């Protein structure tokens, strides 16, 4: 009897946690697993051109495929045209070999009415790109069900004809630049939030209760406003004929013909993101500062320390758990920020999250998933490094 009671006492807390486990599995683990699968698995071309892909598996890639391969792909192109799916295959292969999308539609319209004993010559006459090895290599690459091509493309690499991994052409190198820019923006926004947020948190923690509540309310107000509305409001403030420029011109700080460019660039991204993420530094820092006894500073002063020495040697070290919590939150959120750079960032202020959204909009789920995995792994590495240097157990959020 006692044993049964012991088992029940152990099962009861586990059963209470089951809804939470199910929620995490459905909303986090399953989407994460699907994202990992999408980044390495793509059967669209393989399912559309099964016979062609079977023949291309034995192709050496040195010379053009045989007449059998040409005839087989021509027959399958006709079927795709009848099913109205030829455009999808053209888009998919075009992601591997740019400039080949039109080949598929052009060939589909003309090859169905052709009866010939030499399909190689016929298809080359329809479009001479069928005589290029790059196109056939692209078809073979796009037809692989499992591959790392999305991860290679996500770091501006590609696989050469001989199988080696090389950098893509300079004009196509965009992702590594966006990674660096995203890290730069996340770092700058984190520092700006710290520089601006620490004094605000200090003021909230050390002012009379009435004023402290008003300041805290001002910090919390942005959470009650839509992120989209806040981002859009910055257009009114920062544009060349906006409030800030008009104010500076009215004070004759800048001439009317020398208005500042504060929107649709990196400056707009930094300003808007700092304002949006500032509460995530203020609140954890305030929670820690309010718990520091004021007697510590008085004791340091009584021992001969001036205000600066007392702050640096006594007050600042005790506030680090809150500072570290806020900075970590802001940095991680900055890496994945999307809507604000999209609205106020222009071309120069776009981050890697905007590229993920672009590939989702164009149905390039594999590349979007690969970039997302890279960003996720980067954040996990950051977390591990932070835990090693600072210690996550020392963080305080309340």
Residue ranges of each PLM-predicted region?
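C-terminal transmembrane helix and the adjacent membrane-cytosol boundary/short C-terminal tail
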Residues: 286-297, 301, 369-398
């Amino acid at each position: 009897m006692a044993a049964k009671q012991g088992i029940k006492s152990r099962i009861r807390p586990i059963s209470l946690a089951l809804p939470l486990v199910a929620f995490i599995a459905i909303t986090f683990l399953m989407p994460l697993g699907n994202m990992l699968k999408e980044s390495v698995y793509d059967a669209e071309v393989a399912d559309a051109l099964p016979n062609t892909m079977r023949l291309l598996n034995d192709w050496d890639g040195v010379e053009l495929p045989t007449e059998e391969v040409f005839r087989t792909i021509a027959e399958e192109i006709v079927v795709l045209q009848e099913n109205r799916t030829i455009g999808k295959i053209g888009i998919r292969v075009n992601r591997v070999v740019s400039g080949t999308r039109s080949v598929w539609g052009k060939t589909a319209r003309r090859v169905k009415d052709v009866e010939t004993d030499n399909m190689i010559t016929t298809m080359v006459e329809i479009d001479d790109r069928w005589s290029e090895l790059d196109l056939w290599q692209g078809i073979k690459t796009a037809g692989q069900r499992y591959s790392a091509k999305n991860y290679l493309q996500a770091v501006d690499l590609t696989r050469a004809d001989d199988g080696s991994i090389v950098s893509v052409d300079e004009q196509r190198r965009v992702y590594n630049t966006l990674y660096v820019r995203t890290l730069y923006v996340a770092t700058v926004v984190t520092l700006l939030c710290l520089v601006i947020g620490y004094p605000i948190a200090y003021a909230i923690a050390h002012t009379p209760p009435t004023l402290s509540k008003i300041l805290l309310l001002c910090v919390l107000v942005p959470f009650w406003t839509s992120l989209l509305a806040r981002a859009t409001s910055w257009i009114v403030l920062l544009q060349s004929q906006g409030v800030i420029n008009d104010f500076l011109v009215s004070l004759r700080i800048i001439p009317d013909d020398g208005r500042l460019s504060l929107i649709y660039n990196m400056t707009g991204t930094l300003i808007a993101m700092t304002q949006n993420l500032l509460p995530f530094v203020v609140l954890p820092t305030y929670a820690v500062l309010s718990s520091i006894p004021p007697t510590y500073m008085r004791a340091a002063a009584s021992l001969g320390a001036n205000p600066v020495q007392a702050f640096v040697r006594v007050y600042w070290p005790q506030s680090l758990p809150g500072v570290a919590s806020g900075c970590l939150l802001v940095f991680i959120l900055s890496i994945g920020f999307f809507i604000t750079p999209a609205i106020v960032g222009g071309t120069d202020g776009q981050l890697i999250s905007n590229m993920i959204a672009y590939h989702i909009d164009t149905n390039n789920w594999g590349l979007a998933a690969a970039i997302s995995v890279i960003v996720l792994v980067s954040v996990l590495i950051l977390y591990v490094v932070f835990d090693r240097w600072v210690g996550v157990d020392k963080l305080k959020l309340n």
